[in-house]
Amino acid sequence: AHIKLENIFPNDLLDGVLSDIEKTEYEYFKFCTVGNCFSEFGESTVKLTDYLVGDEWVEFLRNMTEIKDLKSDKSWHGAGINIEPRGSHLEPHTDFNEFDHMWRRVNVLLFLSKDWKDEWGGHNELGHIEGQNYVVDRKYKPEFNNVVIFNTSHYSYHGFDLVSCPNDKNRMVISCYYYSNERGEHGAATSTTNYVGWDRERKKQKEYYNRFGTGWRKLK
């Protein structure tokens, strides 16, 4: 199951997050402790990321998904702010399904790219496997202040197609993951991220995939 929501966050708050990002000098890559880096970007980023793991938003997700014990991950394990420049591409995959003795149940993607053109690609793809082939069921343009929410399971394949924006633009998204004590639609065993249909030629075209905020930060 999946849904797209439009314009549910204040535009001025997201504008503030973009301003925080633009003022932050970042390079590829330095690892920092998960969940403790948002303060490096600015007040707007802290306010938004605190809200995304806070009680009000999580209760909204519980009511939407009917997962009554849904919990946020305040450590932001594997999640955070993603900056994806021209040449970026994320192959279809299913996610790791367990963390801290809980089952991963819901993914939330909040897009931050302004004035994104359809021909620039970077569409969020949701799909399934038929035989040996990956089939795209739905594509979402990564438009500013749009949110895509989908259940996480052993068959919830997703990724994004090749980003072809100008060099001075980036595909930008905040990813958030939510967990439950109930297994849901997962298989019997825990699993790691599982990629399918890996296109090595398109992989070579990827200039770099710059992730920061929870896992990566600027070099001092």
Whereabouts are the PLM-identified features?
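Non-heme Fe(II) oxygenase catalytic core, chiefly the N-lobe of the double-stranded beta-helix
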Residues: 18-22, 52-104, 110-115
